[in-house]
Amino acid sequence: MTDHYPSPRALLDRYDLRAKKSWGQNFLGDEAVLDDIARLAAPRAGDAVLELGAGLGHLTARLLARGARVAAVERDRDMVRVLRGELGDRITLLEADAARLDYADLAARFGAAAAAGEGPRLAVVGNLPYHLTSPILFSILDQVAHVSRAVFLLQREVAERLAAPPASRDWGVLSVLLQREADVSVERIVPPGAFWPPPKVASAVLCALFRPPADAVADPARFRRLVKAGFGQRRKTLRNALGSAKLADPARLEAAFAAAGVDPGRRGETLTLAEWAALERTLG
């Protein structure tokens, strides 16, 4: 099936379409990259995969060729027409906003139990436009119990920030939140020429394998607020950044710094994941 799947340019011509720049549409056509992403998302035949933004169906076809069960999310009606025309009933097509999905419902409908006693989970895969990367990642983190892995094609700079080591220049809010929940790695760099039309910057394949959280926190929602506040004003010390966010009164903040062993004169980007978690626990 994949040997004869038309190129992005051929499909756009067949359906008299053009890539929508306002939607961030750059269609991946490189067969080696498509194969790598499909292998990472669906290592075994029968795996349940949720594809976000299926587009023209190139990755979808690769996933089907590996024996995956694919539910494809797409809200562009032109792309829906292509997917129905090329792949028909071989996929479950969901016309929905990829940033507003109910993963519990989707996992119950399409997922498979990862281990005895666990609820059904999904692998999530997609070529994400820049403007949707953060909303989609936050949505997944809010519902992480229903996701086993995520494999995304992202702008290279974004992927490298998400996989950045603690206390590095690229360490940020989503780095902390994602790495607390998953083992995160950049699997390969993808040049602009792998797409049609080619984007202006390089991309990268990011893989996140979800697992039990690395460091316990008392209140996950408060942990997120704490990390966002700590990185919100990078030039400020933690004492000033967290004080401005009014997460606690000054005396309680100082006591938390002391109990966690964190110098309040440091800046947020210098803290490790374990230090962020310790600081949140001591605020309790």
Swiss-Prot record:
Main location: cytoplasm
Subcellular location: Cytoplasm
Binding site for S-adenosyl-L-methionine: N26, L28, G53, E74, D97, N127
Gene transcribed to yield this protein: rsmA
Name the record gives this protein: Ribosomal RNA small subunit methyltransferase A
Known EC number: 2.1.1.182
Domain of life, source organism: Bacteria
Classification via CDD domains: AdoMet_MTases
Species of the source: Anaeromyxobacter sp. (strain K)
GO cellular component, one term: cytosol
